[in-house]
Each structure stands twice: as C-alpha cells, then as structure tokens.
Amino acid sequence: MLERPPMPSTKTTAAIEPRWRAGQRLFRLLAIGLLIVTIAYDTGANHWQQPLQTLTLPWLVSFALVAVLGMAVVPLLRRLKTGQIIREDGPQSHLQKSGTPTMGGIFFVPTGLGLAFLWTGFAQGKLSPTVGAIALLVLWYAAIGWWDDWQVLRRQSNKGLSARLRLLLEGIGAALFCAWLVASDPTATVVTAPWGWVWPLGMAFIPLAIFVPMAEGNALNLTDGLDGLAGGTGAIALLTLGIILSPYPDLQILAVVMSGACLGFLWHNHHPARVFMGDTGSLALGAVLAGIGLASHHLWELLIVSGLFFVESLSVIAQVLYYKATKGPDGVGKRLLRMAPLHHHFELGGWSELRIVRTFYGVVALLGLLCVLLQWLA
C-alpha cells in the first residue's frame, strides 16, 4: 500500500490540511473512475483469461511504479533546488507555489515509456518498432522541455529557450518522426474517421504530421498551469485512446501505460502540488498523444479528445490578436480574457483551482466518452 507523501514543510499543517484533503479526494475520484473504466473494458473484451493482454494490469503497474519512484525523486529535486519560478504577472495566489520542485517529467515520462516498451515485448512476443519510434519522439520533446526548464532555473527568471529555437527543435523532432512513419507504413498518409470515412491525404499529410506534435506539445504546455490539471486531463485522454485502439495492441499498451504514469505523477502533483511536471513533462505528454494519434491514423479522435487543450491554446492566440487589434495611440490594447490561458481567466473570475481542475476533468471525460461512442456507433 502506498503511503501518503509528506506534507510540504513550507506550510503549517493546520493551514494546508483542508486543501490537501480536497485535492486528495479529487485524485481518488479520478483514479477510481479510470480504474472502473479499464476493468469494464477488459471484462467486456474478455481479456482476463490472458492478464498480459488486459489494460488494467499495465495501467496499475505503471501507476504504482511512478508513484513509488516519485517518493524518492521529489525529495531529490527539492534538495537540488529545482524550485519553480512563478511568473510575476500571473495570479497572485500562485506566488505561494514559488520554490515547488519542477522537472517532474524526468521520472514519470521515461518510466512509462520503458514499461510500455517492455510490456509490448512480453505481451506480443516481440518489441514494437512503432512504440520505439514514438518513445524517441517523446524523449526528444522531453529533452527540449528539460533544456527550457534548466534555462529558467539557471537564469532564475521565466525566460527559458527562445520561442523560435524551441519551435525549430520541436519541428525537427516531428519531421524525423514523420519521415520514419511514412517510410515504414505505406498507409500512413491515410486518415480514418468515424463511420468508415477515409481521407487519403497524400503529400498533405507531411506538413500535418509535423504540425500535430508541435501543436499538441505546446497545447499541453499551456494547460499545465494549475495543480494536477495537465496530469489528470492527460491521463483521461490517453486512456480514451487506449480504449478505442483495439486494432493496434502495441499502441493500446503505450496509451494505457502512459495514462497510469500520469496518474502516478498526479499522486505527487494533485492540489496542493509537491512537484510540477515542468516543460519536461508537458511537452512529452503532448508528443505521446500526437505520436499515438498519427501512428494509428486516428487524428480525428485525437482532435476530439484534445479539444480542451486546443481551446487553451486558442485562448492565448485570441488574447494576443485581440490585444494587438485594439491597441490605441498609447500603445495599450484591450484584453479579451482576464488572463490567458483560459484556466487563468476562470481563476481571476473567482473560481478555485480545484473547481477549475474538476470542471476540466469533466470536460475531457465527456470528450473521451464522445470518442468512444463514435467508435462504437461506427
């Protein structure tokens, strides 16, 4: 049985206990809900006769492994002084998060990828080159995120890598993955949709395949602004993909293992967070969603289940464009939202972190249910 991680020393127990209990209740609700979904799927698919073929077992192993590993890594990150630098123009309530260890992606991302690679090997009798290629894409994005996190910590400011350099590196990784995908799978340029619709994109697939990991990675990066938000929504989205990808058992395992890894990380990241995933984790999380969607030809389903992430991205784009469009002679424009991304708009409107996170979990769960229903109706 996993022990509850120690309470942060920077707060008194009396002040933090109510928030801790509320955050833990939400975490438990999410964990139980996802567990019920995996058990129901395996029961309906009659997988229990072959435990290695179930979704429940790898999901649980991944969750437990990451949660236990975090008990050693989180204190180490704190000793290494990897404390998060909080943006000065952000919500004032976030200033109390300053000093919380970041770069949490370094322990849940490689653990999930390694377990998925090994599990597919044991379950199918051979290692999956597709899982290996996606793992390389994810590690590339994690490395970009780690470099960005490191620059922020080294400079003690929110200025990490330049946007141009970061996008260039992301584009290189996405292009290499796209090249491998097209070379290894002659049907890679064909995108499927519900009700049997098939879209042969031809050469148009290449720019799309490069864009998707970049868009998904940065969307998750923007979503990672509240305790447990990116980790929880990522766990739901990945499990959704795992459920609908029965024709691709290796990608199914990758999706559910990474979902379990997200939940294991959430054990330490739920409100009030004891560690943040940083760009190391958020960029990697977007990359694994994109890689699975591209390799399985399920870009339509990826778009649906990632709807919240893209709304977060669009809120930032809309805020910038509106500000520029309304700029007056004094050089000051108007804001469309109180603050972008969207979760900060709600936060400044008086919503608590837990209310926002709980609501966003529900939105992604509904989008996931829509994906499953569309797959079933097809």
Curated annotation (Swiss-Prot):
GO terms for biological process: cell division; cell wall organization; peptidoglycan biosynthetic process; regulation of cell shape. CDD domains: GT_MraY. One of its GO terms (molecular function) is UDP-N-acetylmuramoyl-L-alanyl-D-glutamyl-meso-2,6-diaminopimelyl-D-alanyl-D-alanine:undecaprenyl-phosphate transferase activity. Coiled coil: none annotated. It is a multi-pass membrane protein. Its EC number is 2.7.8.13. It is found in: Cell inner membrane. It catalyses: UDP-N-acetyl-alpha-D-muramoyl-L-alanyl-gamma-D-glutamyl-meso-2,6-diaminopimeloyl-D-alanyl-D-alanine + di-trans,octa-cis-undecaprenyl phosphate = di-trans,octa-cis-undecaprenyl diphospho-N-acetyl-alpha-D-muramoyl-L-alanyl-D-glutamyl-meso-2,6-diaminopimeloyl-D-alanyl-D-alanine + UMP. Pathway: Cell wall biogenesis; peptidoglycan biosynthesis. The chain crosses the membrane at residues 26-46, 57-77, 103-123, 127-147, 171-191, 195-215, 225-245, 247-267, 275-295, 302-322, 356-376. Keywords: Cell cycle, Cell division, Cell inner membrane, Cell membrane, Cell shape, Cell wall biogenesis/degradation, Magnesium, Membrane, Metal-binding, Peptidoglycan synthesis, Transferase, Transmembrane, Transmembrane helix. Belongs to the glycosyltransferase 4 family. MraY subfamily. Catalyzes the initial step of the lipid cycle reactions in the biosynthesis of the cell wall peptidoglycan: transfers peptidoglycan precursor phospho-MurNAc-pentapeptide from UDP-MurNAc-pentapeptide onto the lipid carrier undecaprenyl phosphate, yielding undecaprenyl-pyrophosphoryl-MurNAc-pentapeptide, known as lipid I. This is Phospho-N-acetylmuramoyl-pentapeptide-transferase. The lineage of its organism: Bacteria, Bacillati, Cyanobacteriota, Cyanophyceae, Acaryochloridales. The gene is mraY.
